[in-house]
Amino acid sequence: MKEEEEIGKPAKPKAKKDVAPGRLIDTYAAQCDNCHKWRVIDSQEEYEDIRSKMLEDPFNCQKKQGMSCEEPADIDYDSSRTWVIDKPGLPKTPKGFKRSLVLRKDYSKMDTYYFTPTGKKLRSRNEIAAFVEANPEFRNAPLGDFNFTVPKVMEDTVPPDPKLGSPFPSTTTTTSEKSSVKQSHN
């Protein structure tokens, strides 16, 4: 906690234009390696921690306090929301930065952005390298931890006519042993 205070407050994105509801991830989930039930993950940070270790330490229900495989699933994979699958093993976002994923209006894919502790939006590896070079206090942030790999949009959960926009106001991100999954729209 002290380290976070020294670096600065977590990034709060400064949006020039609002993103329509349902195009940002609002729920994170991980699939149990044993029972295959989906468990809602409380925060993006916790989700990224699970995803970064998924290959060597698969998620299971017992990793959530008070949870077991005997409990019903927290959330079901269905078309009531748009789901996106994340790749397991992606690194955690460096401290002080915020990774943002935005679903395109046509539901074809997601775009990845990073917000700096000052709120500046970075769209590419070159922009990140330039920011780190210009701000020596962030030189310890490993450039390899800024990953622009985007989750796969699960076509069977996309609304029938994406041009009309989603009838669902949210998105969920999830992770399983073979892949991490994120959901986008409720």
From Swiss-Prot:
Protein name (Swiss-Prot/TrEMBL): Methyl-CpG-binding domain-containing protein 4
Source superkingdom: Eukaryota
Organ and tissue specificity: Expressed in rosette leaves, buds, flowers, stems, mature seeds and roots.
Keyword match Amino-acid biosynthesis: no
SMART domains registered for this protein in UniProt: MBD
Biased composition (Low complexity): 166-178
Function: Transcriptional regulator that binds CpG, CpNpN and CpNpG (N is A, T, or C) islands in promoters regardless the DNA methylation status. Plays probably a role in gene silencing.
